[in-house]
Structures are given as structure tokens and as C-alpha cells.
């Protein structure tokens, strides 16, 4: 990640393998960030933390992991791959396991409305709420401490993401179709996505794989 970040900042040519591909990826990254800004997914930005211990496993320090644009590039590409996988399987008319994130329930929304300042961030047309409203709510916080409190309240509001054969979209990412093709934790549901794509592209290979599964 560090080498790729240096490549991005210094625009050094041919200092890394696949320099041309990296240049193209950074151009794509700019487009993905623009699309992300227009889409306005939920932005909570909880830091990833690392715990340092001594030989006796006593905690010495807890530090935040510093992420750069290279980390975010990979994250955006993973999201794009997951969208593409979901759309590809859907277009082929096959059954699919979508990774859905339901809109918060009416009961949770009513509770959330009573939080200081939250009411102005929610549309007045019924109980409809979007990631845009929640982002506005977080941004309305006065100071870091209040911002963290608001983010914790949003966590309580959100439903749990799950797998479903019904495509109900992903509330947090503000996407119409999403699945777990690039999930770092390989649940069997994720394997099904891979098998479905193999069935589309290489059906004979799927038969060989089936014997080993």
C-alpha cells in the first residue's frame, strides 16, 4: 500500500511493476470517488484499531490504523466488483444471493426522530429515511464528542445486513444491487456467488468443481 501511495503522489514512471495499470486504476479511482459522492453512502468512518501487547499479553497501547488512498482504492474496487457480480447474475436470470441491508424499521425511525436535531434530517414525507439524511445528521454535530454520539445513535438505528434471494438493495451503501463476491470472510453463501459466475462463464468447469465441493 505504501509503495502504491508513493507512486500516486510522485507520479514516478516505471518504478513499480505494472505502472501503466496503476496509472489507469488511479484514473478509475477518481471516477469512483465522484460516483460515490453523488451516491452518498452512509459515512460513519469508525477507525480500525490495533492493540499492542507485551510478552505477557498485557495491553501496552491502542492505536488507530492509518489508511491512505491506496487502501480506499482497494475498497472501492471491491465494492465495484460486488456490484458487477450481482448485476451479472441477475441479468442471466439465475437465482442469486444478494447481500441486502434493509431500510430502518418505522419503530426505530420514530425513536431516532426524538434525538436532538435528528428530526430536521429526516424527510417529512412519512417515515422515509436515506443515507443522505443520516450523513446530514452527523455533519450537524457540534464538535467531535457530539459527532461520535450521533454516530453511535445511528448504529442503533440500522438494521443488520443479511443474505437474501430477494433484491431489496443495500441501505448503507445506497445501492440497488449488491452481493459478497470479494468478501474476505468466505461464508458458504459467498462461495455460491463464485459458483454462479463460473456456471455463467465456464459451465464445464463448474461440473469439475462440483465433484470436489
Segments and roles (model prediction):
Residues 1-197, 201, 205:
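Conserved, carboxylate-rich catalytic/transport cores that coordinate ions
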Residues 209-213:
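Hydrophobic alpha-helical segments, chiefly the membrane-spanning helices
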Amino acid at each position: 500500500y505504501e509503495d502504491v501511495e508513493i507512486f500516486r503522489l510522485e507520479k514516478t514512471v516505471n518504478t513499480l511493476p505494472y505502472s501503466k495499470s496503476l496509472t489507469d486504476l488511479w484514473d478509475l479511482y477518481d471516477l469512483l470517488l465522484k460516483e460515490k459522492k453523488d451516491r452518498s453512502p452512509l459515512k460513519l468512518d469508525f477507525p480500525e484499531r490495533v492493540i499492542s501487547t507485551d510478552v505477557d499479553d498485557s495491553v501496552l497501547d491502542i492505536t488507530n490504523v492509518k489508511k491512505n488512498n491506496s487502501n480506499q482504492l482497494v475498497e472501492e474496487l471491491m465494492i465495484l466488483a460486488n456490484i458487477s457480480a450481482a448485476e451479472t447474475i441477475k441479468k442471466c436470470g439465475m437465482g442469486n444471493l444478494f447481500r441486502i441491508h434493509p431500510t430502518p424499521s418505522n419503530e426505530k425511525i420514530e425513536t431516532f426522530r426524538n434525538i436532538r436535531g435528528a428530526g430536521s434530517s429526516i424527510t417529512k414525507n412519512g417515515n422515509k429515511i436515506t443515507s443522505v439524511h443520516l450523513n446530514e445528521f452527523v455533519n450537524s454535530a457540534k464538535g467531535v464528542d457530539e459527532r461520535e454520539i450521533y454516530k453511535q445513535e445511528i448504529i442503533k438505528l440500522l438494521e443488520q445486513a443479511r443474505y437474501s434471494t430477494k433484491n431489496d438493495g443495500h441501505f448503507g451503501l445506497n445501492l440497488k444491487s449488491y452481493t459478497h463476491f470479494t468478501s474476505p470472510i468466505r461464508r458458504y453463501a459467498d462461495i455460491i456467488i463464485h459458483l454462479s459466475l463460473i456456471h455463467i462463464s465456464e459451465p464445464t468447469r463448474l461440473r469439475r468443481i462440483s465433484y470436489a465441493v
